[in-house]
């Protein structure tokens, strides 16, 4: 499930390093975390929706790859991201 354009803009604004920053790993992780949270809520109602569950696993995998990249580049940014978004690792 996607997120509304207004919500996505809000997430980008709160996670951006500078104005107009939409591609940094921090912003991408924030957007993916929002989409993952939406899908998790969706699965509480629609437990047998296995097609969307596959999409969720792809999102989680993509987020993990981005987090691995951030961890490799800067451990402090990585830990801040985990804490900010409440990601267990």
From Swiss-Prot:
Subunit structure of this chain's protein: Part of the 30S ribosomal subunit. Forms a bridge to the 50S subunit in the 70S ribosome, contacting the 23S rRNA.
Membrane in keyword set: no
Family affiliation: Belongs to the universal ribosomal protein uS15 family.
Segments for region (Disordered): 1-25
Highest classification ranks of the organism: Bacteria, Pseudomonadati, Pseudomonadota, Alphaproteobacteria, Hyphomicrobiales
Organism listed in the record: Nitrobacter winogradskyi (strain ATCC 25391 / DSM 10237 / CIP 104748 / NCIMB 11846 / Nb-255)
Keywords assigned by UniProt, alphabetized: Ribonucleoprotein, Ribosomal protein, RNA-binding, rRNA-binding
UniProt cross-references to Gene3D superfamilies, sorted A to Z: 6.10.250.3130, S15/NS1, RNA-binding
Family annotation (InterPro entries): Ribosomal_uS15, Ribosomal_uS15_bac-type, uS15_NS1_RNA-bd_sf
The keyword Ion transport belongs to this UniProt entry's keyword annotation: no
Pfam families noted in UniProt: Ribosomal_S15
Name of the molecule in the record: Small ribosomal subunit protein uS15
GO biological process, one term: translation
Function: One of the primary rRNA binding proteins, it binds directly to 16S rRNA where it helps nucleate assembly of the platform of the 30S subunit by binding and bridging several RNA helices of the 16S rRNA.
Example of a GO MF term: rRNA binding
Domain of life: Bacteria
GO cellular component, one term: cytosolic small ribosomal subunit
Compositional bias per record (Basic and acidic residues), positions renumbered to this chain: 1-11
Segments forming a coiled coil: none
């Amino acid at each position: 499930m996607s997120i509304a354009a207004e919500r996505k803009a809000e997430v980008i604004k709160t996670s951006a390093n500078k104005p107009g920053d939409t591609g940094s790993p921090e912003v991408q992780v924030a957007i993916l975390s929002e989409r993952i949270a939406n899908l998790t809520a969706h699965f509480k109602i629609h437990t047998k929706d296995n097609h969307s569950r596959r999409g969720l696993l792809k999102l989680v995998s993509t987020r993990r790859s981005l987090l691995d990249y951030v961890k490799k580049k800067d451990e402090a940014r990585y830990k801040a991201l985990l804490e900010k978004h409440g990601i267990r690792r």
